[in-house]
């Protein structure tokens, strides 16, 4: 489920070099760098474990790293959701009832993350509506853009304060309507802080239809296209599949994504998540 060991060094070293080169580009910005993780084709593809794995590798390079999980559902948190609906609930030290991906982050990174590192659509709207009721918007027409997206960017920056790198995992997949405000907010933050402070990683799934017996890249190409419609172009693509992604498929993805060949990472199924 995680990036195979021999490839982990590749993606981490590339991220390391990308951020090292950005240190002197915008000296006025002293905040963290952001690694934004999105998913393509299907959910449950392993975004949380991959995010946690990359975070651990970046820690080994000496970066202080934290992680944020975005869940686009209207529920305020995962506390009242059935386990069969959304998996087990992870309880943080400060009492937050959170998506189970926070548990993976804590175990892999060795951190006690606060409940505020889990953003949901319900939380964002709740905060904005409460502010509107208190008159904090001074009579403005409160809208998804900019008020909702501004609250998202505020939460992301708050979560990253004091760290070198913030991993931001956006739940679901590219193309989900409920993810639109979060993708817009991420792009807005990238524009405001500078693209040199951002790296985008797409985790996609390459199916192998039984009647064909070969890996198909077309769904991944469509995911890349849908992500580009938001002005976001992946710097790295992690290819989840039953088996390793071969050279032919990697080259097809490379052409469609316009990324270096070694930024396309094969992540086949594994017997244990710690391999």
Please place each PLM-identified region on the residue numbering.
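Flexible phosphate-sensing "switch/lid" loops adjacent to ATP/NTP-binding sites
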Residues: 2-9, 15-275
């Amino acid at each position: 489920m995680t990036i195979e060991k021999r490839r982990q060094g590749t993606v981490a070293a590339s991220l390391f070099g990308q951020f090292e080169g950005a240190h002197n580009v915008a000296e006025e910005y002293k905040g963290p760098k952001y690694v934004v993780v999105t998913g393509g084709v299907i959910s449950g593809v392993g975004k949380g474990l991959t995010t946690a794995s990359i975070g651990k590798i970046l820690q080994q390079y000496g970066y202080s790293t934290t992680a944020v999980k975005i869940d686009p559902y209207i529920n305020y948190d995962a506390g009242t959701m059935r386990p069969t609906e959304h998996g087990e609930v992870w309880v943080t030290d400060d009492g937050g009832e959170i998506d189970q991906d926070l548990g993976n982050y804590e175990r892999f990174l060795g951190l006690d993350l606060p409940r505020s590192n889990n953003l949901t659509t319900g939380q964002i709207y709740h905060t904005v509506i409460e502010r509107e009721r208190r008159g904090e918007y001074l009579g403005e027409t409160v809208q998804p853009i900019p008020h909702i997206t501004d609250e998202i960017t505020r939460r992301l920056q708050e979560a990253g304060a004091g760290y070198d790198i913030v991993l931001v995992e956006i739940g679901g997949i590219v193309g989900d309507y409920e993810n639109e405000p979060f993708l817009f907010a991420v792009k807005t933050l990238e524009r405001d802080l500078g693209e040199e402070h951002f790296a985008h990683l797409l985790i996609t799934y390459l199916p192998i239809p039984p009647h064909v017996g070969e890996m198909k890249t077309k769904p991944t190409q469509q995911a890349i296209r849908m992500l580009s419609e938001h002005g976001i172009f992946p710097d790295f693509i992690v290819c989840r599949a039953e088996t390793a992604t071969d050279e032919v498929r990697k080259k097809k993805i490379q052409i469609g994504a316009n990324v270096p060949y070694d930024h396309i990472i094969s992540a086949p199924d594994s017997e244990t998540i710690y391999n």
